[in-house]
Amino acid sequence: MTKLRKIIHIDMDYFFAQVEEKANPSLKDKPFAVGGTNPKRGVISTCNYIAREYGVRSAMPTAIAMQKCPNLILLNTDFAKYKAASAVIRDIFYSFTDKVEPLSLDEAYLDVTDVKEYKNSATLIAQAIKQEIFNKTGLTGSAGVAPNKLLAKIASDINKPNGLYVVTPKQVDSFVKDLPVKKLFGVGKVSQEKLKSMGVETCLDLQQLSLATLVDKFGKFGSSLYNYARGIDNREVNPVRIRKSVSVENTYLEDLKTLGACLEKLPSLYDKLTSRMTEEHYKSIIGIVVKFTDTKFNKTSLTRVAKILDKEMLKNLIIELHQKRNHPIRLIGIGVKLGEIDDKQMDLF
């Protein structure tokens, strides 16, 4: 019999903005956002909940955010400050268990299956972690507790901010049936639209499709979809996860018709990328990459050997890649390759 796992997903609330709010308490009752300080070309990185009441959202162009909230305060990003807070939070995670899988500065999975303290209760452990984070940083985070990573991550988003949501093994079936398929790990806009065209919008809808049908339509991912629709996820919390890359991308509502329009997106993408990188990532950079998807869904990318994350090199890659395109751009992605440089590895790029 498979051992029942106890997984916690911690997601800090409006992390960058909350760190800024803690550093400057006068912001607490004002709508403000981090990033996107250029009112014409900027893009919001994150914002506090007061700003969200006006309709301001992450990844929103600053011009639109200012229309929705004319008195919105814009702050420059301060990644040194965010990384310092993240380091404290990560140390707290490791004080509870060695089985920690960081996903970014403000998010991590913890496997507490074998933790004997707190009556071996994942719920009590999650409460204790949240309290310890608040005691040491003054920051709040939301936690999801479940038998696997898939459900824990979904659960952590339910009672934000400063929330805790528990999915017990007996609740899995009832919990997943009404979930929109877009909540499932690996389901992006393309997969979501494809499923919708098949009459699938919820996990209950997805459960009606056979494994053979899903594999036929989605390949290897079809098998995962079959399991996810039933709340099954066998992925382990990987405390020694070796990442081969860190990347970010954005799909734009308005097609980018000029090189200048593409270059204007680089600062916000760069900020988003650096926010996802840890100190270890910076030490193991072996290359940088830029990719485009155009309005005809053609995908192209360029990679260069590099030992540092160089914004100017990213800019030059965008310029070079843009020269190869015949159609407006809909998606831009940037990232870094991680590992040890050797000729064979670079050929794989």
UniProtKB/Swiss-Prot annotation:
Top-level class of the enzyme under EC nomenclature: transferase
Main location: cytoplasm
Cofactors named for this entry: Mg(2+)
Molecular function GO labels: damaged DNA binding; DNA-directed DNA polymerase activity; magnesium ion binding
Enzyme Commission number(s): 2.7.7.7
Cofactor-binding details, from the entry: Binds 2 magnesium ions per subunit.
Keyword entries, A-Z: Cytoplasm, DNA damage, DNA repair, DNA replication, DNA-binding, DNA-directed DNA polymerase, Magnesium, Metal-binding, Mutator protein, Nucleotidyltransferase, Transferase
Binding site for Mg(2+): 11, 106
GO annotation, cellular component aspect: cytosol
Residue ranges annotated for the UmuC domain, each copy included: 7-188
Catalytic residues, chain numbering: 107
Assembly, per entry: Monomer.
Task of the protein: Poorly processive, error-prone DNA polymerase involved in untargeted mutagenesis. Copies undamaged DNA at stalled replication forks, which arise in vivo from mismatched or misaligned primer ends. These misaligned primers can be extended by PolIV. Exhibits no 3'-5' exonuclease (proofreading) activity. May be involved in translesional synthesis, in conjunction with the beta clamp from PolIII.
Descriptive protein name: DNA polymerase IV
